[in-house]
């Protein structure tokens, strides 16, 4: 950070374009038991859940976080709320309200350690399946979230014919407070400012069993993502940001960083990897040379 600030910035969001990190130095903090967990419900309270999501995203709890998902599996069609607070004694009323929604098929809300919550999430995602991620984002909009449920349900008409298929449309709010806190501890390549918030990262998480279904699944979920982006544009809520860790290989991740950030990434690549080793030889990832 002190000796090569341009490389430090590039590594924070630049994917595998610049080198191999062999050492991390991280600030740590103590953490007592947290409050949180998940609640599984049906689709009937979707409107009220979206309304509470809007409240949280515009007036966030500094100690809380929230994920709201529309889900389909052979066992359940409905919604999932994952809510957490690092201050178990002072949980946001909005989070409490969302986790008392009815009906409930499963409720894991409790006080637990961070590792306990991490294990719970891992247990919900067992290995051995063909798990694909697709992503987009939009500026916070109640109408987008309500209408998105309709296009999600339309996509399922064809997709649910696939044996044991599971699809989730997951909404993760990125608040102004989150962006401000991130910028205070150092710049990165994402090029986000508080004025970009609140916006919402969308993850389409798709799980199927057989390779013979790959082409159908990819095509249909890409179509769902395209319809979602068209909806967001029509509602005046489109966002160019694409979260790299959720991005399918066709996603224009770096384009969402903006021209200034792209120029800095390309300059760092030319300076620290003049032969283009990480562009030509290292497989996978998103290559800055392709932008």
Which sequence ranges carry the predicted segments?
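Soluble FAD-dependent oxygen oxidases
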Residues: 1-291
């Amino acid at each position: 950070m002190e000796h090569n600030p341009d490389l430090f910035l590039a590594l924070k969001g630049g994917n595998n374009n610049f080198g191999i990190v062999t050492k991390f130095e991280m600030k740590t903090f103590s953490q007592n038991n947290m409050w949180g967990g998940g609640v599984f419900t049906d689709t009937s309270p979707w409107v009220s859940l979206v309304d509470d999501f809007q409240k949280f995203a515009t007036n966030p709890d500094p100690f809380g976080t929230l994920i709201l998902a529309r889900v389909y599996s052979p066992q359940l069609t409905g919604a999932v709320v994952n809510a957490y607070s690092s201050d178990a004694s002072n949980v946001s009323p909005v989070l409490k309200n969302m986790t008392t929604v009815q009906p409930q098929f499963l409720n894991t809300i409790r006080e637990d350690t961070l590792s306990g919550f991490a294990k719970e999430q891992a247990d919900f995602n067992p290995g051995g399946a063909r798990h694909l991620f697709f992503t987009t984002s939009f500026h916070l909009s109640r109408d987008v979230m309500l209408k998105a449920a309709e296009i999600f349900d339309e996509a399922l008409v064809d997709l649910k014919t696939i044996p044991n298929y599971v699809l989730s449309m997951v909404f993760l709010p990125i608040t102004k407070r989150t962006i401000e806190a991130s910028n205070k501890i150092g710049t990165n390549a994402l090029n986000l400012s508080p004025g970009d918030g609140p916006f919402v990262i969308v993850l389409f998480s798709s799980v199927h069993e057989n390779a013979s279904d790959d082409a159908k699944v990819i095509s249909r979920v890409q179509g769902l993502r395209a319809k979602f982006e068209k909806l967001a544009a029509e509602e005046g809520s489109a966002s160019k940001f694409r979260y790299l860790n959720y991005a399918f290989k066709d996603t224009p991740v770096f384009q969402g960083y903006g021209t200034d950030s792209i120029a800095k990434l390309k300059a760092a690549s030319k300076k620290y990897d003049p032969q283009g080793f990480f562009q030509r030889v290292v497989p996978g990832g998103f290559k800055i040379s392709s932008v």
